[in-house]
């Protein structure tokens, strides 16, 4: 049970950081990597 909570917290924090960076600047690097 504890492991599940810790993993959930880790994923949520990573998601928040990713969204913050994604919305702060346009995804120019991401589009270049995919293409």
From Swiss-Prot:
Keyword hit for Transmembrane helix: yes
Q: How does it sit in the membrane?
A: Single-pass membrane protein
**Which residues are listed as membrane-spanning?**
3-23
Task: Identify the GO cellular component terms for this protein.
Answer: chloroplast thylakoid membrane; photosystem II reaction center
Q: Does the keyword Cytoplasm apply?
A: no
Tell me which UniProt keywords the record has, alphabetically.
Chloroplast, Membrane, Photosynthesis, Photosystem II, Plastid, Thylakoid, Transmembrane, Transmembrane helix
Which GO terms fall under biological process for this protein? photosynthesis
Pfam family of the protein (one)? PsbT
Question: InterPro entries under this entry?
Answer: PSII_PsbT (IPR001743), PSII_PsbT_sf (IPR037268)
Please give the chief subcellular localization of this protein.
Answer: plastid
Q: Where is the protein found, in the record's own terms?
A: Plastid, Chloroplast thylakoid membrane
What's this protein's function?
Found at the monomer-monomer interface of the photosystem II (PS II) dimer, plays a role in assembly and dimerization of PSII. PSII is a light-driven water plastoquinone oxidoreductase, using light energy to abstract electrons from H(2)O, generating a proton gradient subsequently used for ATP formation.
HAMAP family tied to this protein: PSII_PsbT
Its assembly, as annotated, is: PSII is composed of 1 copy each of membrane proteins PsbA, PsbB, PsbC, PsbD, PsbE, PsbF, PsbH, PsbI, PsbJ, PsbK, PsbL, PsbM, PsbT, PsbY, PsbZ, Psb30/Ycf12, at least 3 peripheral proteins of the oxygen-evolving complex and a large number of cofactors. It forms dimeric complexes.
Similarity remark: Belongs to the PsbT family.
Q: What name does this protein carry?
A: Photosystem II reaction center protein T
């Amino acid at each position: 049970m504890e492991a599940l909570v810790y993993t959930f917290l880790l994923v949520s924090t990573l998601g928040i950081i990713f969204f913050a960076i994604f919305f702060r600047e346009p995804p120019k690097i991401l589009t270049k990597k995919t293409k």
